[in-house]
Amino acid sequence: MFANTTAGGVYRWSDGNVSTVLEKRRGIGGIAVHADGGFLVSGRDLAYAGPAGLRTVWAADGATGLNDLTVAPDGSVVVGVLRHQPRRGEAAGPTELVQVAPDGGTRVLASDLLWPNGVGYAPDGTRLYVCEYAAARVRVIGPQGASVFAEAPRGECDGLAVDVEGGVWVALGSGGGIARFDSGGALVELIEVPGRFVSSLAFAGTAIYLTTIGALLRMDVGVPGSEIPAAAMQID
């Protein structure tokens, strides 16, 4: 599945065919599969999409929206909070990355991120990586706190995915490509995607699917992605 952030909606690609899964909702920065077969989407809030339609499960006070997200090993959801209006040209100020537990309780994992974007866990679940779009870097959050993990070789750090070897893949936005960093933060691969703004990426086996402005692309990178569990948030 993938979202059209500007025009709105969630779509499914299968065997060359695209179908609409959720209509109209704009500003979606992330999607996560839920354990009951529905899915969660960000946007103006964190919402559950199921047979009965959309239902808000969490919203951040004073936020302009919620951006990219992932699922933690315990089934909780980690999501970046937006507090500026990027479409109005507002500069990004420090904001939070929040973990929303299955029972709805929250914990702030970081509070000084400049436009939190792509987010993903290391295969062993001990470290969490998050892109800072406005700072063009990736931060890592671990037992000792948060630190800078890697800097974008060009462009920005937008979407993020992690492979089973601990490699961290980053969509480089206006940089026209994707980068792979090893678990120590060293750049080990830079793949060109000419003429494209690469906004996000996700694994399916050894293939990476890339979202760009106007296109969905696929490439095989020879290593599978780290498994992301289904969200276990309670839906009333």
Task: Label the predicted regions.
Residues W13-N17, A49-G53, V100-G104, G142-G145, ...:
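Short loop/turn segments that connect beta-strands within beta-propeller blades
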Residues M1-E23, L46-A47:
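Beta-propeller domains
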Residues T5-T6, G43-R44, L82-H84, A92, ...:
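Short loop/turn segments immediately following the C-termini of beta-strands
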Residues A136-R139, V148-S183:
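Loop/turn-rich, solvent-exposed surfaces of beta-rich toroidal or solenoidal domains
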Residues N17-E23, G53-A60, G105-S111, G145-E151, ...:
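A short beta-strand motif characteristic of beta-propeller blades
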Residues G9-Y11, D45-A47, R88, T95-V98, ...:
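A short loop-to-beta-strand structural motif that recurs across blades of beta-propeller domains
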Residues V198-D236:
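Blade-level signature of beta-propeller repeat domains, shared across WD40, Kelch, NHL, RCC1
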Residues K24-G43, D61-H84, P94-E96, A110-R127, ...:
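Beta-rich, blade/repeat-based domains predominating
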